[in-house]
């Protein structure tokens, strides 16, 4: 596998092995407590149900230290598939598509899917 050279970093690197432990433990995409998909609840809501609480807490922690988030996915009934990435391209962003792809390539995704997001409901910034 690839290794990160701390001397080559020009920022912070935060790695969370799993963002959705409730779904992982249940072997589903959704949390059994509220049947919500964590990926679809970002940035979360501290007044919402348990999945919204998790999304809010995680998003606030990452947002405080990151200019870009690499969000890898897997799927399959036992989460045994190859990782993939959906990357978001925002109009006027300081982070280029080439930079996003370079960041995701470190994780060797089986596929990277581009998503143009300029709608009013999307958060500003880059999420890969």
Whereabouts are the PLM-identified features?
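Structured catalytic-domain cores with a bias toward divalent-metal coordination
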Residues: 1-128
């Amino acid at each position: 596998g690839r290794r990160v050279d701390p001397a080559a970093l020009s920022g912070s690197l935060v790695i969370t092995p799993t963002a959705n432990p409730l779904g992982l433990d249940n072997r589903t995409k959704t949390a059994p407590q509220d049947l919500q998909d964590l990926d679809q609840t970002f940035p979360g809501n501290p007044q919402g149900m348990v999945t919204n609480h998790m999304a809010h807490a995680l998003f606030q922690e990452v947002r405080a230290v990151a200019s870009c988030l690499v969000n890898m996915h897997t799927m399959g009934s036992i989460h045994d598939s190859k990782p993939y990435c959906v990357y978001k391209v925002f109009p006027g962003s300081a982070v280029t598509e080439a930079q996003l792809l370079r960041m995701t390539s470190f994780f060797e995704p089986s596929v990277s899917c581009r998503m143009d997001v300029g709608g009013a409901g999307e958060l500003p910034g880059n999420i890969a």
